[in-house]
Amino acid sequence: MVCVTNGLRNAFILNEYQSLRTRVYMLGGELKPGAASITSFTDTNSLTEQFVYDFSFFSCRGIDLDGVYEASLGQAKIKQQIMRRSKHSILLVDEHKFDSPHFYKIADFADSHSVITNTLPTEDYQKRIDDGITNFIWLNPKLRSQPNE
C-alpha cells in the first residue's frame, strides 16, 4: 500500500503498521502550528501529479450544498489536485462543519464521491442523497458496542 499524506499523525500511525508493507510519502511545506499538518506546500504539484489515487480521504473546514471549503489556500490547492487524480474521493465531515462555508472553495459538493459523517443529514442534504449525487455514510457513535461489564 502507498499512502500520501500531509498529516504528521497519519504518517506516524501508518509507520507503525510495517506489516502492511506501507510506503508513506509526506508532502513538504510549512508545519501549521498546533495542527500537526503541513500547509503552504512547496513544489507538491510535482509529487501529487506522480500518483493516481484509488481513494483519497480528506477533511475540510466546512461544507454547504454548493461546496466544500478550506480555510487555507495551500490546503485547498493540494486537496483540489489530489481530488482530480482520485478514482474515489471521500470527504470526512463532522456535525459542526455542515452549512459552514469558508474562504476557499475546494470543490462542488457533488464532486465528492462519498461523505462520511457522524450526524444525520438535514432534509436539504437528504434530497441530494436521494438524487444520487453523493453517497452519505452515517456513523452513529451511539451505536458503538459497549464493553461487557
Language model feature labels by segment:
Residues V4:
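Short, conserved beta-strand segments within well-ordered enzyme catalytic domains
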Residues A11-E149:
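Conserved phosphate- and dinucleotide-binding cores of soluble alpha/beta proteins
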Residues M1:
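A short alpha->loop->secondary-structure connector
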